[in-house]
Curated annotation (Swiss-Prot):
Keywords: Cell projection, Cytoplasm, Synapse. Its main location: cytoplasm. GO terms for biological process: neuron projection development; regulation of neuronal synaptic plasticity. It comes from the Eukaryota. InterPro entries: Neurochondrin. This is Neurochondrin. It is found in: Cytoplasm, Cytosol; Cell projection, Dendrite; Postsynapse. It comes from Gallus gallus (Chicken). Coiled coil: none annotated. Pfam families: Neurochondrin. Belongs to the neurochondrin family. Probably involved in signal transduction, in the nervous system. Required for the spatial learning process. May also be involved in neurite outgrowth. GO terms for cellular component: cytosol; dendrite; neuronal cell body; postsynapse.
Length: 702
């Protein structure tokens, strides 16, 4: 408790409060208590004594009162009630009490009311209460739902007394409840961003670098910033300010926050925040160049990340470099010309050399560091697109990448639907549950097509890991309703990797037990997936992979007359047989062969898979005696005969004719009933018409 005369006075006041017989006596004692509270610092025990003597009831009545003692300002009672609550709120236990949380609208109202010179203490008390509430477990959520977030925004934009405290509280609230704040109060937050953006463009005294630190908190990832007019204007202002800053000579402490702000804009808007034209293209090239230089200068040091805050800066640079990769690969509407692309690719290659160098130094105890994850993630983005550079360095790093991905997958389990970009990570956040494999898969798909990296991946046990990962991702897709784009893309890429392995390392498929488990999952998954038309690309991948694996694993137990095997082949027949149809030919009065309407939108993605699937099905026919019967039951031969009879021969290209002939010959040789169906539907005639010599020969034999 405070010492000296103040302590004695406070003690007497507390006695009066406890013994008060009416409101007048209690109010008189409260006024003395308030004076004592303001006069000096109180310890926790004293504050608790005040609360025990007063409770919440009387302050609540003071806050709701619209009267005042004769000769006093009308807000006297409210000011007294706020002072008491501000005193109580210094105790965390009381700050989180429902009686305080219920007063959040009152605190917000004080911030938005016109502040007279004699009201500043009320505003101070309201801010003190809100700051205390923010520090409690329930506080941030209650502040959002009860209107404190919007009030803080308005208080800052209005620029009245205490507006800087409003901004500080907003920053704290966004740090813990960003998504909820934007979901509920986007217009008010955009108003704050608008004010900050205008200040940013005008600032010339060094404060623009302080604003670079603040602004990322007010840049939302969703909804997209550029979709609303107010947001678009903010983006324009921020670009203008950053272009001015980054075009000047900067110290390290000035450049770092500018790069982080640019990365935040990139995460929110991609490259769309940078205007088209030569000015924008030069700025983008400068930005990516600066990011690459920063990565090299930092990661090539012996102790690269000892400096405080360096990880956040380099991670921001990763976001900018990823934007550079995407712009260099754009075929249309790229901000960069060809010369700029070539230059940036060379500069980025040097930066990724530094990333590889850093990752090779990572120790076992550092594997949980989020910065390692960010570095692996951005390297995965490079490996997905650039397959010719740093090949030797990547090969040497592959054992680490496989080990790292396995550790995260086995220990944490993959986290679904992480943002695709490299991401700004906090140095103290956990990577438990983050999914490194997802970002490495496209690169692995390229590498499994090449001998040396494929051999390294196999020797490090990557195929078994990838099989386990496929089974897990399939479980995620089937257990969570709705569209899981990233999960589906991962499954498609995994199918591409396995197709590479089937073609180049068939013995591996026979010997690795996990591929039998994978085969079993493929057999069961296609019948489930195919009826869902929005998953056609994944279904095509699974159908084709299952067929080519079935050729290798035909003698395995999982494929021997099992119900799931027959269901799978029925589904593949359905997928392959429904890809083409007859439609009116604009160039003639006849019909032309065309891709079926249900397949048109996906055909570019599944065309090669369809042809490979037809080839694999033909190879499977002699291996599975019951397969021709499945084709007969599906009536595919009748439908194909009718299709080839109806359309003009000129509309069927040679590659398609070869695909049909391969399956038809296989069926005619393996099954007398199939041969008879083809013959009974004028097979010899259209075989001759389409130049299917092998089929003609097969049909002519008795």
């Amino acid at each position: 408790m405070a010492s000296g005369p103040g302590a004695a006075t406070l003690k007497k006041c507390l006695e009066v409060l406890r013994d008060a017989r009416n409101d007048s006596e209690q109010l008189a004692a409260l006024l003395l208590v308030t004076k004592a509270v303001r006069a000096g610092d109180l310890d926790s025990k004293t504050r608790r004594q005040i609360f025990d003597a007063i409770g919440f009831t009387f302050p609540n009545r003071l806050l709701s009162s619209r009267q005042a003692p004769p000769g006093c300002p009308e807000h006297t009672f409210r000011a007294l009630g706020l002072t008491l609550l501000a005193c109580f709120c210094t105790e965390p236990e009381l700050a989180g009490h429902s009686q305080v949380l219920n007063k959040i609208p009152t605190f917000a109202d004080v911030l938005l009311s016109p502040c007279q010179p004699d009201c500043t203490s009320m505003v101070d008390d309201a801010y003190q209460c809100l700051a205390a509430v923010l520090a409690t477990p329930r506080g941030p959520r209650e502040m959002v739902t009860k209107g404190a977030a919007s009030a803080l925004c308005q208080a800052y934009v209005n620029g009245g007394y205490g507006s800087e405290r409003a901004l500080a509280l907003l920053l704290g609230l966004l740090a813990v409840s960003e998504a909820k704040c934007w979901q509920r109060d986007a217009p008010h937050l955009l108003a704050v961003l608008s004010k900050l953006s205008e200040e940013f463009v005008r600032a010339e005294d060094g404060s623009q670098f302080e604003l670079c630190e603040l602004l990322p908190r007010f840049i939302p990832l969703s909804p997209p910033l550029a979709e609303v007019s107010q947001g678009s204007e903010c983006v324009r202002q921020l670009y203008k300010g950053l272009a001015s800053i980054l075009g000047s000579k900067l110290s390290q402490s000035q450049r770092d926050p500018a790069l982080k702000l640019a990365a935040s804009l990139t995460q929110a808007c991609g490259s769309e925040w940078i205007p088209a034209g030569s000015t924008g293209s030069k700025f983008l090239a400068l930005l990516v160049n600066l990011a690459c230089v920063e990565v090299r200068l930092t990661l090539e040091e012996p102790e690269p990340l000892e400096v405080e805050g360096k990880k956040e800066v380099v991670t921001a640079c990763y976001v900018l470099i990823e934007m550079g990769i995407q712009e260099c690969l754009k075929e249309e509407e790229s901000l960069l010309d060809e010369a700029q692309r070539m230059q940036l690719m060379r500069i980025m290659e040097e930066a990724f050399g530094a990333v590889v160098f850093y990752l090779r130094q990572v120790k076992e105890e550092e594997l949980q560091d989020p910065f390692v994850f960010a570095s692996v993630r951005i390297l995965g983005a490079w490996m997905a697109e650039e397959t010719s550079s740093l090949k030797q360095e990547i090969c040497e790093l592959l054992p680490f990448l496989v080990r790292y991905a396995r550790k995260l997958f086995k220990e944490g389990g993959p986290a679904e639907n992480l943002p695709q970009t490299a991401g700004l990570v906090s140095s103290d956040s956990s990577i438990l549950g983050q999914d490194a494999l997802r970002f490495l898969l496209p690169g692995f798909c390229h590498l499994t097509a090449e001998d040396r990296p494929r051999d390294i991946l196999i020797s490090e046990g990557a195929p078994a890991l990838l099989c386990d990962y496929f089974l897990h991702q399939w479980g995620v897709l089937t257990s969570q309703p709705g569209s899981l784009t990233s999960t589906e893309m991962s499954l498609q890429t995994l199918c591409g990797i396995f197709l590479n392995l089937v073609v180049t390392a068939p013995n591996l498929i026979r010997q690795e037990k996990t591929f039998s488990s994978l085969m079993d999952t493929l057999l069961k998954s296609l019948p489930f997936l195919l009826p869902q038309k929005d998953h056609l690309v994944l279904a095509a991948n699974i159908a084709t992979l299952g067929l080519v694996m079935a050729r290798i694993l035909s003698s395995s137990a999982v494929l021997q007359k099992t119900g799931s095997a027959k269901e799978f082949f029925r589904a593949t027949i359905c997928f392959l047989s429904q890809a083409h149809t007859a439609q009116a030919d604009p160039g003639s009065h006849g019909l032309a062969l065309a891709v079926s309407p249900a397949y048109v939108s996906a055909w570019d993605d599944i065309r090669e898979l369809w042809f490979l699937g037809m080839q694999a099905l033909a190879s499977c026919v002699p291996l599975f005696p019951w397969l021709p019967q499945a084709v007969l039951q599906a009536q595919w031969l009748e439908e194909l005969s009718e299709l080839l009879t109806r359309v003009t021969a000129a509309s069927v290209d040679f590659e398609l004719i070869a695909a049909f002939q391969g399956v038809l010959v296989g069926l005619a040789r393996a099954s007398k009933p199939c041969r008879e169906v083809i013959l009974s539907h004028h097979g010899e005639e259209w075989a001759n018409l389409y130049g299917m010599a092998a089929l003609e020969q097969c049909l002519s034999k008795q």
